[in-house]
Amino acid sequence: MKDDFAEEEEVQSFGYKRFGIQEGTQCTKCKNNWALKFSIILLYILCVLLTITIAILGYKVVEKMDNVTGGLETSHRRYTEKLTEVESDLKKLDDQAGQKALNTNTELSSFRSDILALRQQLHDIAEKTTRNKDTLEKLQESGNVLDDRQSQIRSALDSNSFMIISVNKTLQAYTGYINNLQQDTSNIQSDLQNQVHSHNVVIMNLNNLNLTQIQQRNLISVLQKSMEDKSLAILRIKNDFQNLQQVVLQARKDTDWLKEKVQNLQTLAANNSALAKANNDTLEDMNNQLSSFSGQMENISTIAQANEQNLKDLQEQHKEYENRTSAKFNQLEERFQVFETDIVNIISNISYTAHHLRTLTSNLNEVRTTCTDTLSKHSDELIFMNSTLANIRLDSASLKMQQDLMRSRLDVEVANLSVIMEEMKLVDSKHGQLIKNFTILQGPPGPRGPKGDRGPQGPLGPAGLKGQKGEKGEPGPPGPAGEKGPPGPIGPPGEKGGKGSRGSPGSKGQRGSPGKTGLPGPSGDPGPPGPQGKDGPQGPQGPPGFQGLQGTVGEPGVPGPRGLPGLPGVPGLPGPKGPPGPPGPPGPGMPMALQSEPTSVPEANGCSPHWKNYTEKCYYFSIEREIFEEAKLFCEEKASRLVIINNKEEQQWIKRQISGKGSFWIGLTDSEKENEWRWLDGSLPLYTNWKTGQPDNWNHGHGPGEDCAGLIYAGLWNDFYCEDVNNFICEKDMDKEQIFGV
């Protein structure tokens, strides 16, 4: 630049000394000077033009710099606005994540409270089961005590039966002694014929003894009548022994009274098989004694003379024996009274235990139904909670993915912003240098010089300032699980928590199935004797006996006990069909329906009264309650059957009919083969409407299970014990004749 200015000074000094004045003499030199002057003038003009263009260019450059700075400011504002928007979006996302976290925390807390309530309910159920176990153990102990008492009663009854057998044997021996006192051989032979006939009758009755207990009692009454006939014959033969006969009658009164007591004991202990066997043994002994009696009667004729001397001794012995027997009878009466009181106490205890067992089974049924309902509800709630947890996990995973995407986007945006800021810093530095260069160029610039050689490389600049700390990076993937550490020491027991708030009462459970029917009650005391029956038909005429001696008229005997009614006879065969009757006179010409009034007007739907019609079938909905077999027999007596449900429409119609009326039997059972349900006609069900969890064949762990089906509330099917008492539904085909008025 200095060289240029020096040249310009030299040129100026050369030109301005003589500006077209002193060059007249030298022509060539003048021409050269004028050319130089003209060139200098042109140079000045060019310099002025250059300065003007440079000024214009500088103005344009300044305007462009102003535009660039304005654009930088607007871009900076836009970036700041975008950054604020991004920060607000991040805050909104953080708020939403916090709200979702709070919602998840509340749901988890409610879930924990529900789990605690479930645990409390399970704990209560466990306590109830322990209580029921205690009650069952007590019942088992009471059952064992009852078994011991029953064994004692059986032993006492065995001893009583043995005593009765001994008394019967003594009485038979006593009758044998009395029979040995007969003297008149002719009368004894006639009596023997009667005895043989009665013996044949007794043998025939003994053959029919094993059929029923009623025939056995009739046979005993026949034997008693034969003994009374024999005693009357002895009274007619022996007029001298009237006093002895009165004593015998008194003894027989006592025996009849004793037999009545024995019959009462037999009715009270009807289920005692040992007593029945003892009665059979006594009857067999009586048969043997009767057979021996026929042999003894043959020897009576030889022994009669010897017995005359022993009559007085026998009378004394008989008096002593009477006293002994009266004392023994008094003792037996006292023992029987004690036994009766013991039996009454035992029966009351058994009835009390049976009632207690019924209540316990009903309670167990209620507990079972409540447990099943609560378990089903809890299972539904757990399934719903599992589904909600799965949804929460999916939502949390999606939120995590969105957060990761937002973080990656933020990182990219921040990196882009950092790059843009660096670029803007560089642009600002360049603009600053340009502005400095523009401020230095104050004077008019000179002409551009030649390009100089490249200078040496300058030293490195100082290191820049340390940048700000970057944001926290994304969490890395989880590392592998470490080895399990040693178990730590057991911590101290925590403090007992405060009592939680009482939970809301649960919803009312479904109605449980009815309990099993109780055991049959004990047989009651025998009722008072009924009125005297009518005289029976006359028996067959016996063979004529020998003419006996005329005896004295004896005292009227004590009326014997009333005999039991006989078995109903076998119905006879139907008689032959009679000949057709003559035709009747012609009637008036009116229809038969108008001539006779029907006894019971059938309904217009073709069903009997109290029956309902549906799809060409009649249905009977019972008001009374029966067990399954009784309900089946009732329907069969009505020429129908227990209902068979074949489709959903029939099920819905029956459901509407029985709503709010309890449980009803249907004709479905698996009694033939377990878990193979069939209708009573043997067909498999094509349509079912079981309650959830049914049939469960619940049998309390003992005895037969639930083998009969019925309808419960809402028309659902459930399995019951066949001994349960329910209503029932009968079904039969519609009588089409009633529809047409036939």
Curated annotation (Swiss-Prot):
SUPFAM superfamilies: C-type lectin-like (SSF56436). The chain crosses the membrane at residues 38-58. GO terms for cellular component: collagen trimer; collagen-containing extracellular matrix; extracellular space; membrane. Widely expressed. Residues 502-522, 532-556 have a biased composition (Low complexity). Residues 1-37 are cytoplasmic. Ca(2+) 2 binds at D670, E674, N697, E706, D707. Ca(2+) 1 binds at I644, N646, E650, E731. It is found in: Membrane. Scavenger receptor that displays several functions associated with host defense. Binds to carbohydrates. This is Collectin-12. It comes from Gallus gallus. The gene is COLEC12.
